[in-house]
């Protein structure tokens, strides 16, 4: 059998026939590199996030967030004090009754409001998980609830009345279809109570329902760590870290890091909590310092010398990639360590603390209850459990 002749040459002698698959791939990559514009920069997840409505509307500095909460609290205090004044003017109160009102019908502080919001945000998570809703729906419900109480005060809208509404709206937002009647039945609520504050919730969210959660970056980092540290990480161990980080991310959504950091940064912070040495090594390998020095991170893995052509090509790719991102690993580590400390330092209030705050909140909104309680006390009736029955947390 003879080879097909092309211009006097065998097809076996042509470059396309003798070129290996790896060489072809390298040639295509080289062509792509040459075709890139001079100011080419790869778009990262952080870049995409910073063009989202979530970033524009719900990202704050620490001072901005504090100021927003103080303003919301101040408006509610003015509203409560006006109602208390109207109540006193409308009723002929005794001196003792006035003293009781002044002592117990006191508006909540900003810190007390935040504690109550955090307590009920945890309840949103527990209820949503009890309903076997997907992780993304649970995360969105938590986000909706906490954002709602940046715009509104617990002294004006009872947190309990908005819990099921946020979960149901999260189902719709994340395309998890369930009818309102089915949802109300599963949540042991009613159709009217689920829908009562839905428009108010939408209005408070500024009709911005798309959420960027840290779960997607977690999957990306899970794959990229295995690629960057190829042969140096145990897959079973990485699987365990992945599962634990998903839980940590859900816990992180109950903190203020969602207002200060991007989803990939939050993901890296949760990974840092699980294994700081692994994350440090990954970042320093992927984004080497600009001076070319690279600190070693202690580990149990043995590194084997690799001097073949494929290793050289991989190193070139990593170098090009890190130039495109222009990320300083030391600076990034500083940022995610700050995020990590906020996640770890956040402690939700206990049930007992939440009950005290809820009772105080109930009294300032319902001063007549205090007067009735005082009268029953003067008549020798038991009043110890009256508010607890009305204000179950």
Swiss-Prot record:
Family (UniProt): Belongs to the cyclin family. Cyclin C subfamily.
Biased composition (Basic and acidic residues): 21-35, 300-321
Protein name per its UniProtKB record: Cyclin CCL1
Biased composition (Polar residues): 1-19
Disordered: region residues: 1-45, 289-325
Organism for this UniProt entry: Saccharomyces cerevisiae (strain ATCC 204508 / S288c)
UniProt superkingdom: Eukaryota
Keywords assigned: Cyclin, Transcription, Transcription regulation
One Pfam match: Cyclin_C_2
């Amino acid at each position: 059998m003879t080879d097909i002749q092309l211009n006097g040459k065998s097809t076996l002698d042509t470059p396309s026939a003798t070129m290996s698959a790896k060489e072809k791939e390298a040639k295509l990559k080289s062509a792509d590199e040459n075709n890139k514009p001079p100011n080419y920069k790869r778009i990262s997840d952080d870049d995409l996030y910073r063009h989202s409505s979530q970033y524009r509307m719900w990202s704050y500095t620490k001072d901005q967030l504090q100021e927003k909460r103080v303003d919301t609290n101040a408006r509610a205090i003015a509203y409560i004090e006006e109602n208390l004044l109207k109540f006193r003017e409308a009723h002929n109160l005794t001196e003792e009754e006035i003293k009781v009102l002044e002592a117990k019908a006191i508006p909540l502080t900003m810190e007390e409001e935040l504690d109550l919001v955090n307590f009920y945000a945890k309840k949103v998570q527990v209820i949503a998980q009890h309903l076997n809703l997907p992780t993304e729906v649970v995360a969105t419900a938590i986000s909706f609830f906490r954002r709602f109480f940046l715009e509104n005060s617990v002294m004006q809208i009872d947190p309990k009345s908005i819990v099921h509404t946020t979960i149901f709206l999260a189902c719709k937002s994340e395309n998890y279809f369930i009818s309102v009647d089915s949802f109300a039945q599963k949540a042991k609520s009613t159709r009217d109570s689920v829908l009562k504050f839905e428009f108010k919730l939408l209005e408070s969210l500024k009709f911005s329902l798309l959420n960027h959660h840290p779960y997607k970056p977690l999957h990306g980092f899970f794959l990229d760590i295995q690629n960057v540290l190829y042969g140096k990480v145990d897959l079973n161990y990485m699987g365990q870290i992945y599962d634990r980080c998903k839980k940590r991310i859900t816990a992180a959504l109950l903190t203020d890091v969602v207002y200060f950091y991007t989803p990939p940064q939050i993901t890296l912070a949760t990974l840092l909590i699980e294994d700081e040495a692994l994350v440090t090594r990954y970042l320093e390998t992927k984004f080497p310092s600009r001076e070319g020095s690279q600190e070693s991170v202690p580990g149990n893995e043995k590194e084997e010398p690799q001097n073949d052509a494929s290793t050289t090509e991989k190193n070139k790719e990593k170098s090009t990639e890190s130039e495109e991102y222009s990320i300083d690993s030391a600076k990034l580590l500083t940022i995610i360590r700050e995020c990590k400390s906020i996640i770890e330092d956040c402690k939700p209030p206990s049930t007992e603390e939440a009950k005290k705050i809820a009772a105080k909140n109930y009294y300032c909104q319902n001063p007549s209850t205090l007067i009735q309680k005082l009268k029953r006390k003067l008549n020798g009736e038991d009043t110890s459990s009256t508010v607890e029955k009305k204000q179950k947390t």
